[in-house]
């Protein structure tokens, strides 16, 4: 019994020792328990705990960048291109885009093949089935070539039709615009036009500023002293006479400078008539001289 009481007395003392062996045993025991727990945990949980830490996240980010860089080099292609300004740029293209692949060769048709294809297109724009097979056999072409030619020909016809419609629409619009401009100009000219004054020579037999005797003798034949007036149109007789022009338009100053032999009432051709009269009277005088 004494031993049992001593053991009971020793128990509390061991618990009270802060830095004794019991504390160190507890730490080792906790570490062993942690190891056991991690050993029993699944690999996914371990990866999740490591990724949750900042160091683990950095390590995982570095690995992903390396994988991306490796994938970029494997699946991408870098090309150096010089632009118009002389600057060199780097373009990253996928390797699936084969730039070195030769272009597809265009099918060249002979004149006879084109003629037959055009004739068939004018007859029917869609050739299918046996007709296409027979046409390809006759022209020594494949059915694919015949099919593609008809597709391209239909596309070309649609483009031509749309272009013609645009031209017609533009021409009709321009014609309508020109017609409207002409009509507008004619309307403006009709509204702005002023009625012309009647001709003075057609309305009056002579100039209104001159005397009445001079009006009638202004147009006289030098060989015939009888006055000859211009014929008056019938329409001018009924129309009213215009107001007389001012006297400054017909000044009588030149008439004052005429010699004294010229009278205002006489004709301007009176000297010529006097000469004719003298010629007519000259044979009688010569006869008188002969008698003397």
From Swiss-Prot:
Keyword Cytoplasm on entry: no
Tissue expression as described in the entry: Expressed in the developing and mature retina.
Domain of life: Eukaryota
Locations listed in the record: Nucleus
The keyword DNA-binding is annotated on this UniProt entry: yes
CDD domains: homeodomain
Single GO MF descriptor: RNA polymerase II intronic transcription regulatory region sequence-specific DNA binding
One GO location term (cellular component): cytoplasm
Main location: nucleus
PROSITE patterns: HOMEOBOX_1 (PS00027), HOMEOBOX_2 (PS50071)
Residues within the DNA-binding region(s): 102-161
Similarity-based family: Belongs to the EMX homeobox family.
The protein's name in its UniProt record: Ventral anterior homeobox 2
Organism encoding this protein: Mus musculus
The encoding gene: Vax2
